[in-house]
Amino acid sequence: MPIGIPKVPYRLPGGQSQWIDIFNRLALDRIIFLGREVDDEIANAIIASMLYLDSEDPEKDIFLYINSPGGSVSAGLAIYDTMQHVRADVATMCVGLAASMGSFLLTAGAKGKRTSLPHSRIMIHQPLGGAQGQATDIGIQAKEILYTKDRLNQILSERTGQPLERIERDTDRDFFMSAEDAKQYGLIDQVVQHRPV
């Protein structure tokens, strides 16, 4: 039986309390949680949250916690572009799994603020795609996915400091890493053992 989304108490001005869902409570502390596959719906919610939090206070970090198997490249790139657009630093943390577009977003965090819990797994690979229809349409789709693959590899190379040739080789197939391996690779900056007080 599913437990649903937990509700937690929130103290209103004046001393009264009300129960709100935990994700809304986390958002009050500038924490956004990506805990599912990346699609247009979750991308729009994350983008809207980042834009709002940035307009509220561009000097305070936004925290993006990631436990995601990946998903839509276009939706993920929309989140990536927003992370680079907002004035506030976006600190990222892997909590469980950051695979495919999930790992791309993990690496997109502000340099020095990309972290992972010690037993998390991080996986990079090339984008997946498929096409059907007339031969000309399939050719158009093939060119587009190759362009996307090249662009993602270039960004990963820039964000990690790895040579483009290594990124191309490593993303040719699923490439899993431990948190410590991801740190050595340049996907993250720190493996977090304990939360700072």
Swiss-Prot record:
Enumerate the UniProt keywords alphabetically: Cytoplasm, Hydrolase, Protease, Serine protease
In the record, what terms sit under GO molecular function?
Answer: ATP-dependent peptidase activity; ATPase binding; serine-type endopeptidase activity
- Tell me the Gene Ontology biological-process terms attached to this UniProt entry: protein quality control for misfolded or incompletely synthesized proteins
A Gene Ontology CC term for this entry? Answer: cytoplasm
Subcellular location(s) per record: Cytoplasm
InterPro entries assigned: ClpP (IPR001907), ClpP/crotonase-like_dom_sf (IPR029045), ClpP/TepA (IPR023562), ClpP_His_AS (IPR033135), ClpP_Ser_AS (IPR018215)
What EC number(s) would the UniProt record show?
A: 3.4.21.92
> If you read the UniProt record, what top EC class would you report for this enzyme, in one word?
hydrolase
**SS bond partners:** none
Its recorded reaction(s) are: Hydrolysis of proteins to small peptides in the presence of ATP and magnesium. alpha-casein is the usual test substrate. In the absence of ATP, only oligopeptides shorter than five residues are hydrolyzed (such as succinyl-Leu-Tyr-|-NHMec, and Leu-Tyr-Leu-|-Tyr-Trp, in which cleavage of the -Tyr-|-Leu- and -Tyr-|-Trp bonds also occurs)
Q: Where is the active site?
A: S100, H125
Tell me the superkingdom of the source.
Bacteria
Task: Quote the SUPFAM superfamilies the UniProt record gives.
Answer: ClpP/crotonase
Q: Subunit structure, briefly?
A: Fourteen ClpP subunits assemble into 2 heptameric rings which stack back to back to give a disk-like structure with a central cavity, resembling the structure of eukaryotic proteasomes.
Similarity-based family? Belongs to the peptidase S14 family.
Per the entry, what this protein does is:
Cleaves peptides in various proteins in a process that requires ATP hydrolysis. Has a chymotrypsin-like activity. Plays a major role in the degradation of misfolded proteins.
The name on file for this protein is ATP-dependent Clp protease proteolytic subunit 1
Which species does this protein come from?
Gloeobacter violaceus (strain ATCC 29082 / PCC 7421)
Q: Which gene encodes it?
A: clpP1
